[in-house]
Amino acid sequence: MAILKRGARNKTHQEPAKRGGNNIKKAAFETSKKKEVGVSDLTLLTSISDESINDNLKKRFLNGTIYTYIGHVLISVNPFRDLGIYTDAIMKSYQGKNRLEVPPHVYAISEAMYYNLKAYNENQCVIISGESGAGKTEAAKKIMEYIAATSSTHSESIGKIKDMVLATNPLLESFGCAKTLRNNNSSRHGKYLEIRFNSQFEPCAGNITNYLLEKQRVVGQITNERNFHIFYQFTKGASDNYRQTFGVQLPEQYVYTSASKCTSVDTIDDVKDFEATIKAMQVIGLAQEEQDQIFRMLAAILWIGNISFIENEEGNAQVRDTSVTDFVAYLLQVDSQSLIKALVERIVETNHGSRRGSVYHVPLNIVQATAVRDALAKAIYNNLFEWIVDRVNKSLHAYPGADKSIGILDIYGFEIFEHNSFEQICINYVNEKLQQIFIQLTLKSEQDTYAREKIQWTPIKYFDNKVVCDLIEAKRPPGIFAAMNDSVATAHADSSAADQAFAQRLSLFSSNPHFEQRQNKFVIKHYAGDVTYDVLGMTDKNKDQLQKDLVELVGTTTNAFLTTLFPNQVDKDNKRRPPTAGDKIIKSANELVETLSKAQPSYIRTIKPNQTKSPNDYDDHQVLHQVKYLGLQENVRIRRAGFAYRQGFEKFVERFYLLSPRCSYAGDYTWTGDILEAVRLILQDALIPEKEYQLGVTQVFIKTPETLFALENMRDKFWHNMAARIQRAWRRYLQRRIDAAVKIQRTIKERKEGNKFEKLRDYGTSLLGNKKERRSMSLLGYRAFMGDYLSCNESKSNGSYIKRQAGISEKVVFSFHGEALHSKFGRSAQRLKKTFILSPTTLYIIGQVRVQNAMQYTADYKINVNSILQLNMTNLQDDWVGIVLANSSMPDPLINLSFKTELITHLKTLNSKIQVKVGPTLEYQKKPGKMHSVKCQVSDTAPKYGDVYKSSTIFVRRGNPANSKSKKKPRKKSSGMSAPTTQSSKTLAPPRMSSNNQNTTVSQSLNGGMNVKPQTPASRSAKKPAPPPPGSKKPAPQPMAKKPAPHPTPQAQMQTQTQIPASQSSATQSSIPPPPPPPPSKTSEPQFEAAYDFPGSGNPSELPLMKGDIVYITKEEPSGWSLAKTLDGSKSGWVPTAYMVKHEGAKAPPPAPAVTASQPAIQNQSQPASAQTVAATSQVPASFGDGLVSALAARANKMRVESDEEAAASSDNDDDW
C-alpha cells in the first residue's frame, strides 16, 4: 500500500476568508447516499450468532437497505416494493468499481463476474438460492440487465444477441412462472442461462437449460393460486383474430384457470404482460406462424380442461358435451371420435412370450377418464415449453465465436406445503444439491484447500448435507427415488399397488437419522427444515409416461407443429423401462453440478422477510429460521478466519508480474527463476505486508479483499503510468528544444537590439541627468530593471498574497519593500515599513500589521499615476523620494526605497509629464498646500549602506560621482558545475606575482586557509577585496602568508604552476608533504579572524566585525557568506567569507624552505614577515573588487527570492541596484 505524505503545516496558517457570491454551490458528497445502518458486511459484526445476524438484517430491511455481504457472498432480503435502486444512474455508478468502493448491490456481484471474466479469462456463474418468494428471479433479471448494459457492443449482431438475452426473461416468465401463496411470480421451473462471450468479451451467444417444469399446475392449483401466467395473459389480451379462430374466452370460462378462484392479482397487469410476451417472441425471432401455433396449443389445453364426463348405463365414463371435444379436435387437427375414444377407453395388450397376445379395449370410469384428459393437457404444455426453450437456444446459437460464459442459475426455491407430493420432493432435492455445491465450494473445499496447501488454519465445524442428498438419489444402497422406481416396476399397471409397494420399501430407511416414516407419509429432514411428503399418487407421477392411446392419437394429427412437439412414436418392441421423472431430475441435477463446478462461482442468498408479501413486516422467527438453514453463521466464521483470494502460482504471476521490475521489463515477463520466487518478488515489490498473505504448496493466499483490490488497482494503472512516463520524457525533450530555441532567440535579439531591462536601466540613469551621486551597487553590470521583485504576478508567492490582500487586480509593473516617513504632531517622525506596488494606473503604498501572529496588508495610499506632478530627490546617494501630488487632500508621501531610480523610471514611462527634480534639498507637501524642505548632508558617521533621517535632515556618506557609468555586463561562466577540487600529492602553486620576490609561503597559505566547499561559479566570484597598499604600516597579527586565497580559480592555478621555477617547485615539494585525505568533521568549530573591517549594512541578520576579531564559522554558503558567532556565543550573524582567514593561534610559522636556485629567492628569504605579507597581498588580481560585487549581487538575488521575510528584506537592500 502506498504511503501518503503530508506537507508540513504552518502554525500561523489560517483558513482563507470566505468569498461572497452565490454562483458556487456548497460541495456535497453523495447526498443521495443513505446513512449506514448496521454493518454492510456481516464479517464486521462484533458478535457472531444467528440472532445478531438477524438483528442486522432487520435494521437494514426496515431502513430500505436490502443487500448485505458476507465477504463475496451477497445476502438479499426481498423488499416487496420498488426501492428505486435499479436506475441507469445507479447502474453506471457500479461500472468499473470493486465491491468495497460501492454499497452492497446485485450490480456489484454482476460487475465482479464480468471483471473476472475479462481479467482471468475464466467462466463465471452465479448461484441464486433461497426459498420461494425470496427474490431469486428478480435478482437473475437484474444481473442479466447489468451485463447486457455493461458489455461493449461493436456490431449490430452483438446488440441483437443482447436484446435476445433480455427478451428471454418476459417470455420464460410467462410460460414458466405462476402465482403461489408465497410469491406472485414464483418460478415453477428451473433454468440455467449461459451468456457466452467472444474474444472481445462481447455477448455473442446464449444457452438455456430447463429443469423440471411443474406441469401438474396446468390442470390444478390450490385455492388462491393461479395457473401459469400465459393462460391469463392470453385469455385477457388475445386479439380478435385469436378469439374467433381459437375460440378464446375470458379466464373465468375455463376450468383450468378458474377452479382456484383467483383469476386476477393486484400487482399483475396481464394485458400489459401479454404485450411484453409478444414483443419478446418477435425479438427472439419467432415467426408469426410459430406464434400462431403456440397460441393454438394454449387454446387447445384450455378447451381440453373444459371436457367433462358423466356415467353411462354401464357406469363407465362418457363425454358430457361432444361440442367441446369437437372443438378440441379442430384445434389439434385430429379426428373427433378418435379423441373421444382415447379419453374414455384404454387399450390393453397381452403378451405370451415372444408371441403377440390379445388386444382389449377397456372402458374407463370418470376418475380415470379425467386423469387421461389431464395427462394430455400436461403433455402438450410440457412439450410446448421445451420446444420454446429449444427455439430460443436456436436463436441464441446463431452467432459463432463463443469462448467464455457467465451462467445465471434461477431455479425454484425450497418448498414446504401442507400437502407435499412428488413435485416438492424433486424441487427440494435440487435445492439440497445446490446447498451441497455451496458447502463444497465455500466451506468444505476452502478448509480442504487450507489443509492441502499447509496453510495455518483453525478448522470450523459445519453441517454437510451430503447424507440427505444420498438418502434421495443413491442407488447402492438404494435411495428414495430408486425405491420408487422399483415400486413402479413391480406394480406398473396399478398405481395404488405401486404406492403401497413404495410405502413398504420406505422401511429400509428407518435407520437413517434424517428420515422418518409415518403410515402413508414420510419425513425428510432437509437443510431448510423437516418436510412431510404424501405417498399416495407419488409413483404415478414418477412414471412420467403418456398412455400409448394418447401418443397414437397425436400421431394421427395433420398439424405439423403438434407432430414436432411429440416426435417420438411408440416403440412397441422396446422392452426396456423408459426413464422415470426421478431419473430425469437426478440426471439434470448432476449435470448442473458438473456445469457449475467448471465455472468460478458467485453466490446470492435470498431471504423472504414474511409470508404476507408486505413491505413493512419483518418476521423474526421466519428469517431466523432461514439464517440457520442457509448456514450464514458458519459462512461468517469461515470468512473471518480465512482468505479472501487464492490463486495458483503460475496464474498469479501471469496476472501480476507487471508489478515487479525484477520480473518484467516493458510489459514482457523476464524472470527465469523459480515460479515461487517470482510470487515473492511480486508481493515484495508491491509492498504487501507478510501478514496479508500466505504461500501454500501450489497457491498464494491473500487474506483481505482490500489487498487484492490494491494489487488490481496497481496493475490497472501500470500501463497508464508507463504511458505517463513516456509522455513526460517526450514533453521534457520538447521543452528542452523550446527552451534552447528561446535562449538562442533571446541572445540574438539582445545582440541586435540589446536587453530591454538594461535599456530601461540606462534610460533611468539618464533621467537623473548626472545630478545625483551613485551608489556602488547601482553601477554593477548585472543590474537590470526587472520590475516585479516580489513576484506579485505569480500565482503562489508572498507578493501575490500581498496583492490579493490589498485588493489589487491589475498586472504589477514594479514591486519592492521600503519605508515611508510618518509624521506625528509634537513627536519625531517615524520610518515605517511599507510595500510599494506599481500597476499601469496606480501606485500603491501598502502598510502591514501583525494580527494573531499573521501578517495582514492594507493599501494606505492609492495614487493615480496621472496625479503625480513631481518626483523630488537630493543630489547625494540617499534613497529618499518625495512624491508631489496634484490637488490632493492628503500630505505627499516621502518614501525611502533602495530601487528608487527604477520606480522613477517606471513612473516616467507611464506618465511622461512627471517632472524629476534633483537638488541639494528635497521638497514635498507635508500638509496639503504647504511645501516642506528636507536637507541632505554628508556624514562619515552615517551607515555605510544606508542613511539617517533626523529633524528634516538626511545624513549619508559620500557616494560615487554623479557621472559614473554602469559597468558592462560580465560574461557568464559555463553553466556546468566544475569538478570538486581534490588535493593531489603535489603542492598547489602560489598565484602569479608581478615582482620577482616570490615565496613559497604563498603556496602554504593556499593549503593553510579555510576548508571551503567545492567551488561553484557563485563561490568563485566571492573573492575578498584588495588589502591596504604596500606603504601602509598596519601591523599584521601573523604573517599574511598564512592567510588563504579561499577561492582560487583553476586558470590562476594553472598559470602559477607553469611559472614557478623547477628548483622552487622541488623545494616546495620537499618542505610541504602532500596533504592527507579530508579528516572527519571535528566537534570543535574552527576559529577565523577578520582580515578587514566589516561594519555591516544595518541588517539585524549581519554580524559587524573589526579587523582582527576572532569568531567561529558554523556554516558557509556558496553565495559568498558565512554564518559566524562570537567566541562567547552571545552574538551570531552573517559575514563575508572573503573577509575571513583561518586563525592559527600561537602556532609558530613553518620554517622557510631551502632555496637551492637563484639569488632572488635568497633575497626573498631575508625579507621580514611584514614585507612578505605586502609582497603576497599586493599581487591580488585587478578583478578582485568585481568578485566582491558579484558576491553581493548573489546575496541580494537570494534576498529577493526570499521576499516573504519582511524584517530582513526591508533592511537588507544595500543600494539602488
From Swiss-Prot:
Region (Disordered): 1-24, 956-1102, 1145-1174, 1197-1217
Cellular compartments per GO CC: actin cortical patch; cell tip; myosin complex; plasma membrane
Keyword hit for Nucleus: no
Entry superkingdom: Eukaryota
Region (Actin-binding): 405-487
Bias (Pro residues) ranges: 1025-1038, 1072-1081
Positions where Phosphoserine occurs in the chain: 358
Biased composition (Basic residues): 1-11, 965-974
Composition skew (Polar residues), residue ranges: 976-987, 1162-1174
Biological process according to GO: actin cortical patch localization; actin filament organization; endocytosis
The IQ domain, residue ranges: 720-740, 741-766
Biased composition (Low complexity): 994-1007, 1050-1071
Residues involved in ATP binding: 130-137
CDD domains (alphabetical): MYSc_Myo1, SH3_Myosin-I_fungi
Post-translation changes: Phosphorylation of the TEDS site (Ser-358) is required for the polarization of the actin cytoskeleton. Phosphorylation probably activates the myosin-I ATPase activity.
Pfam families: Myosin_head, Myosin_TH1, SH3_1
Role, per record: Type-I myosin implicated in the organization of the actin cytoskeleton. Required for proper actin cytoskeleton polarization. At the cell cortex, assembles in patch-like structures together with proteins from the actin-polymerizing machinery and promotes actin assembly. Functions as actin nucleation-promoting factor (NPF) for the Arp2/3 complex.
Annotated family: Belongs to the TRAFAC class myosin-kinesin ATPase superfamily. Myosin family.
Domain text: The myosin motor domain displays actin-stimulated ATPase activity and generates a mechanochemical force.
UniProt name for this protein: Myosin-5
Species the sequence originates in: Candida glabrata (strain ATCC 2001 / BCRC 20586 / JCM 3761 / NBRC 0622 / NRRL Y-65 / CBS 138) (Yeast)
